[in-house]
């Protein structure tokens, strides 16, 4: 429940100051919202491209699906490369810290050419492509998620300012102003009446 409005000059000044602050802060919020909307659109495109690349890599790897069901070949792929370098950082976009994937390096390990079929290179290359594309796709999705989350938060604040805080404060100022004006008129009337009575007593 909201507190009762104090119909005083101090309250009037406080509400006017509050309205000024809201009016000053709203453009900043709206600018941030616009920036976030642009960044979200960009992140959506990047995420879509990364997901498409990952799906294509997965489809190419599915060509070897039967081979992945054979433990000998599955073990060969698992033992033939590893994630050697994984560099991540944090990037600030419109005030939001999002993960930045700087570099991922998959290192190929030595394996016996005599003990593996000639197509094992294609199988390993397909698996490496899939792993890399999945890492980048997951990073792109996380960036998008964080930006969308902040956009929702800022949008809620903009709506709160525009639909509730500013109109409510303006209405409060108007109500106090009307009350103070009416009271001033009443006070003037009472003063005139008092002066008139004093004058009558003198006569």
Swiss-Prot record:
Assigned keywords, A-Z: ATP synthesis, Hydrogen ion transport, Ion transport, Transport
Keyword Zinc: no
Keyword Ion transport appears in the UniProt entry: yes
GO molecular function: ATP binding; proton-transporting ATP synthase activity, rotational mechanism; proton-transporting ATPase activity, rotational mechanism
InterPro entries noted in UniProt: V_ATPase_D
GO BP annotations, alphabetical order: proton motive force-driven plasma membrane ATP synthesis
Family statement: Belongs to the V-ATPase D subunit family.
Stated name of the protein: V-type ATP synthase subunit D
């Amino acid at each position: 429940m909201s507190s009762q409005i104090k119909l005083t000059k101090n309250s009037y000044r406080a509400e006017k100051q509050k309205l000024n602050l809201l009016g000053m802060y709203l453009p900043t919020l709206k600018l941030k919202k616009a920036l976030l909307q642009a960044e979200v659109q960009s992140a959506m495109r990047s995420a879509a491209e990364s997901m498409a690349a990952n799906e294509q890599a997965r489809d190419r790897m599915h060509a070897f699906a039967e081979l992945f069901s054979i433990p000998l070949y599955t073990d060969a792929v698992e033992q033939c490369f590893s994630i050697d370098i994984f560099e991540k950082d944090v990037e600030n976009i419109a005030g939001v810290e999002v993960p930045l994937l700087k570099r991922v390096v998959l290192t190929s390990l030595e394996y016996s050419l005599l003990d593996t079929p000639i197509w094992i290179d294609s199988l390993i290359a397909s698996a490496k492509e899939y792993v890399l594309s999945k890492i980048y796709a997951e990073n792109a999705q996380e960036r998008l998620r964080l930006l969308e989350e902040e956009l929702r938060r800022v949008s809620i604040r903009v709506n709160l300012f525009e639909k509730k805080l500013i109109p409510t404060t303006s209405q409060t100022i108007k109500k106090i102003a009307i009350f103070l004006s009416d009271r001033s008129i009443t006070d003037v009337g009472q003063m005139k009446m008092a002066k008139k009575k004093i004058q009558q007593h003198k006569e």
